[in-house]
Amino acid sequence: MNRILFHSLTIPPDQVSTGKLVAEIASKFKEKNINIEILASMPQYRFDSSEFTNEGFKKISGNVFVSTYKGVKITHLSSSKRSFSRVKRFSQWISYHLKSIIYLTKNRKNFDTIYIFSYPPTMNLIAIYSKKILKKKTIYSIWELYPEIAQKLNELNSNLLLGLFKKVDNFCLKVIDSVVVNSEQLKEYLIRERNIDDKKISVIYHFANEIETPKSEKLTKEIMYAGNVGTPQNLESFINIFSSSKKEYKLTIYGSGSQFDKISDYQSENLIVNSFIHRDELIKQTKDIPFALVSLSPKITIEGFPGKTFDYLKMNKILIGYSNPDSSLANFIEQHNVGINISPNEKNLDSKLDIFEDAKVVQQIYQNITYVNNKFANIDIISQQYIELA
């Protein structure tokens, strides 16, 4: 029997969408009687060591805990609360990788195939180790492409380091068995710019395996945003054009991140900024908000696709994208007609919002949201695509 290991940084009870996706996919492997376990960190975002025991964590050594998720065993490696400092965050990644390598080496006889999920971007080091040293079948799922994102956002200004990272990443993608990406555009980029064999690249979309919540009863002029508040999200730019709107929309933000304090300074009658809250509470507080903002730096095109897109759709929110018109996000919104995309170069926000004054257009968008939820947020379809790679 093929013994599978999923390796991720985040996993429930961390309230991080990517970690929840990994856990849900693993649970579907388990339902099909596939031998599967997960290796992840201890919670970094919702961190309270006093609560670990209450949430089903069992300490088996100084740095190792175990828990279960829908019958899937999870081994957690100890970690500290996520830092928003770049230097500290990088050191956290490396520390986690070292612990992972020790664990994988000690337990290499317990698994045959390893699925590695790409955040952080340095997970490529583990993928290389898995394939070249441990000789395991290795599938690497890329949700954001580095160093391209770091370069475009000026997060790494050393050409030497950028070149070195790209060489390491390319080596990883060429030696492993399969690569998973979340858009056709990213697949085409890897083939064209990175010379990766198209036969080893599979496109599997993000999804949100949550219960679909009812749409808001009224089409009020309210927009929500929930998630990371950092440089890639480009929220400050959206707020600047939002503040010039005469449509009297209200924007409510729920989040945390490196730009949170700065964004909080913009609070006004029409802009409310709240700290991160859990999804159940988020649904309660936003049930009457019909629109959701998905904001992305205009420098990012195919390199990243916000996972919250599908979470918003499961909440039956009409999407307001704020991204480069050539981005995978803009392409998705417009191709499936689940909202609008606004270019960061747009000078007149109100002219874009006019479309929502047509009741027939809004009705069609809601129908399209239902279609997309059934097609792209179907956990059975998504998990089967991953199973076929094993």
Label each region the model flagged.
Residues M1-G62, N240-K246:
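N-terminal subdomain of nucleotide-sugar transferases
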Residues M42, Q185, I204-F207:
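Carbohydrate-associated surface elements
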Residues T105, T122-L125, Y129-I133, N159-V179:
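Membrane-proximal helix-turn-helix segments that form the acceptor-binding/catalytic region
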Residues K166, N170-K200, A330, Y386:
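A short, active-site helix/loop in glycosyltransferases that binds the activated sugar's phosphate group
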Residues S216-Q233, I239-S243, L251-T252:
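Conserved donor-binding/catalytic core segment of Leloir-type glycosyltransferases
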Residues Q233, H278-K287, A292-L313, L319-N331:
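Nucleotide-sugar-dependent
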Residues F260-I283:
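Nucleotide-activated donor-binding/catalytic signature segment of Leloir-type glycosyltransferases, i.e.
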Residues P344-S351, E357-A390:
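A charged, aromatic-enriched C-terminal amphipathic alpha-helix characteristic of glycosyltransferases
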